[in-house]
Amino acid sequence: MAAESNFVDYVKIYCRSGKGGRGSTHFRREKYIPKGGPDGGDGGRGGHVFLRGNRNYWTLLHLRYDRHIMATNGQSGGAKRSTGANGEDRIIEVPCGTAVYDADTGEFITDITEHGQQVMLLQGGRGGHGNTFFKTATNQAPRYAQPGEPAQERMVIMQLKMLADVGLVGFPNAGKSTLLSVLTAAKPKIANYPFTTLEPNLGIVAYRDKRSFVMADIPGIIEGASSGKGLGLRFLRHIERNALLLFMIPADTDNIAKEYEILSRELVAYNEELAQKRKVLAITKCDLIDEELCEMLREELPTGLPVVFISAVAQQGLEELKDTLWKELSKETLHEPDSIVRQALDLTSLTWDEEDDLFPASIEDDEDEEGLDDIDFDLEIEYDNEGDDAPDQL
């Protein structure tokens, strides 16, 4: 049995904020003042659920084993107008490049792209008012208090779309992993058979004057990948966040122009807005052909596209390639349209593992509060049925 990969780029989790604490119906009790006025405090706020970007995470693996995220409830109000303690917030640490969607509708919720960026996913319920709040000139001994707001809950899908400056695009065995290993310190698996790369790999390319950029090796694309063939849709989404696409086609390919057309068509079929991204074409394995043949090939290539002839094994053309990539990355118009990532998620295209069929966690409350699911926070109150706690007359 193959070992389970540590690269997890999607996960489905259940999240719930804390509900607000109920207000207190307490009445003042002091020596020589057996029947004082109301002094019940407000309930505490329920805990919020936040998302926070963390550059120390590279995958969503840590969430695969912690998929019920629940903040704690606010505490009830107390005597002497004391407010109940707020519920403890839950912060979900995610890698930069994580997009979050509603698991039921596919609606885009938010996008975490920077280290330290924090977004509230679910808001905790407000605490209910104690009976002190309801005291008026005509009602000086209210025997009721307000319950807290109910918790919010949501099933969400998190997808990691790797943040990289340059994404390597090509058919299996195009030499993408070899190029990444030569230009960076990354050590991807390299072998002479298709689909050697089964998960994305990142590496940092050192450039002149201590400058650098991030390169991502995406698993090979085949014709029909946009329909789920090969490794299909799972890894095409990582291309969405690459600022520049480097198409890699071997020099011994029968028809380079046709292969480039197929690759471009698959990307556009997956997401039409990928056509807006800047592209560079690298003809790989050029150590297998002579310069005269290279010039003949150049005449057959698509026009209006930067083309570089390279050989990662023989380290030919690599400096020219880095110059070309940096030049394209430096252009002011190189920006990713927000709509590429922020469009709704097509839930029908997802194939979840059996373990991803989550059910909401059972809710165990510390206190018995009925009817909280249907309350109108602004109107509903709870009466104190214990008449002994209230004064007969003030």
UniProtKB/Swiss-Prot annotation:
In terms of PROSITE patterns, this protein maps to: G_OBG, GTP1_OBG, OBG
Cellular-component GO terms for this entry: cytoplasm
Where does the record place the region Disordered? 26-45
Ranges where the OBG-type G domain occurs: 164-330
Localization per record: Cytoplasm
Chief location of this protein within or outside the cell: cytoplasm
Instruction: Name the protein family.
Output: Belongs to the TRAFAC class OBG-HflX-like GTPase superfamily. OBG GTPase family.
Protein name, as recorded: GTPase Obg
- Organism from which the protein derives: Porphyromonas gingivalis (strain ATCC BAA-308 / W83)
| Gene name of this polypeptide | obg
